[in-house]
């Protein structure tokens, strides 16, 4: 059995980590299967680890976006790759932090490395527009 080591990729910064009610934890295979099912919601999954400095640095930005978009039809999740390596392996996660943008069981985009709040928000709004049919065509022509 081979072991693969995850790497951290991000700029230097302050290390902090916290959880808010706007961000839910994925702790089981069943929860992940529901999320990735054909009726799964628009969601962003943050793959992280406690030892990963860039993950801790990005956590407040991720949570700020989740809080700002609370009540919208988009969900925000965190998956601890140290506690649940088998769930991370299912997505072939190789670097931390990694954000996967998913909708109806499909990965729509991925962001690798620590991201600024503005970048996370822009991608979250893009996914939200895609999931609710508020894309460019709809905005232009109704």
Regions found by a protein language model. Name each.
Residues 7, 14-15:
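Short, positively charged and aromatic/hydrophobic N-terminal segments
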Residues 24-42, 85:
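A short beta-strand-turn-helix
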Residues 40, 48-51, 95:
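Short pre-active-site segment immediately N-terminal to redox-active cysteine/selenocysteine motifs
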Residues 52-55, 99:
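The canonical Cys-X-X-Cys-His
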Residues 54-70:
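Typically the conserved alpha-helix immediately C-terminal to a functionally engaged Cys/Sec
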Residues 79-88:
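Structural microenvironment flanking redox-active thiols in thiol-disulfide oxidoreductases
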Residues 95-135:
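Non-catalytic, surface beta->alpha helical segment in thiol-disulfide oxidoreductase systems
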């Amino acid at each position: 059995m081979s072991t693969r080591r995850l790497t951290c990729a991000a700029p230097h910064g302050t290390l902090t980590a916290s959880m808010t009610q706007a961000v839910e934890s994925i702790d089981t295979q069943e929860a992940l299967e529901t999320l990735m099912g054909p009726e799964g919601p628009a969601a962003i999954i943050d793959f992280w680890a406690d030892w990963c400095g860039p993950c801790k640095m990005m956590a407040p930005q991720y949570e700020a976006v989740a809080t700002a978009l609370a009540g919208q039809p988009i969900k925000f999740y965190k998956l601890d790759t140290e506690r649940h390596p088998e769930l991370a392996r299912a997505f072939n996660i190789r670097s931390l932090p990694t954000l996967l943008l998913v909708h109806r069981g499909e990965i729509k985009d991925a962001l690798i490395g620590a991201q600024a709040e503005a970048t996370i928000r822009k991608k979250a709004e893009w996914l939200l527009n895609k999931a609710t049919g508020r894309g460019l065509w709809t905005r232009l022509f109704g």
